């Protein structure tokens, strides 16, 4: 699952290598035993970004066939914490930094134009099944 935090036209991203060939990604991860989706999102966001968040609406559910997982994207709102206070070993891929990046720069950072458009439009169709993860440009 991933969390999307947008503030003043800027989106929260991790600077880390990804399997998509870009060096920026959305924060998120996997559920641990006994966790709800909301608990997992709160934990992953804190570990990877240093921020406390309040989980919001489900944005999209997608298939991520190569990894044999269902990918869920949630909206989240910052409620506290310290940006960049990343927990050591928070991810299997080292996190080099955390930043709020202008949404308009998403394509320059390797995200698809489709994803940038969805963010800008406020995620039309939120809460729906979108098919493959590529359908939302991730």
Enumerate the language-model features and the residues they cover.
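Vicinal oxygen chelate
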Residues: 56, 86-92
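Active-site-adjacent beta-strand/loop module that shapes the phosphate/pyrophosphate-binding cleft
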Residues: 63-85, 99-103, 118-122
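Short connector loops at helix/strand junctions that flank enzyme active sites
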Residues: 6, 26, 53, 67-71, ...
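A conserved beta-turn-beta hairpin within the catalytic core of GNAT-like acetyltransferases
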Residues: 19-22, 68
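Nudix hydrolase/Nudix homology domain
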Residues: 21-24, 91-138
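The catalytic Nudix box helix
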Residues: 26-58, 74
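Conserved N-terminal beta-strand and adjoining loop/helix that marks the start
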Residues: 1-11, 30
């Amino acid at each position: 699952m991933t969390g999307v935090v947008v503030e003043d036209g800027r989106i929260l991203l991790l600077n880390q290598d990804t399997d998509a060939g870009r060096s920026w990604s959305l924060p998120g991860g996997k559920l641990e035993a006994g966790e709800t989706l909301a608990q997992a999102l709160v934990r992953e966001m804190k570990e990877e970004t240093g921020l406390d968040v309040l989980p919001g609406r489900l944005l999209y559910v997608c298939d991520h066939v190569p990894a044999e997982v269902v990918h869920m994207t949630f909206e989240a709102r910052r409620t506290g914490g310290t940006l960049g206070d990343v927990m050591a070993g928070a991810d299997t891929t080292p996190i080099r930094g955390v930043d709020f990046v202008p949404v308009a720069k998403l394509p320059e950072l390797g995200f698809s134009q489709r994803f940038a458009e969805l963010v800008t439009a406020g995620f039309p169709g939120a809460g729906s099944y979108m098919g493959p993860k590529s359908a939302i440009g991730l």
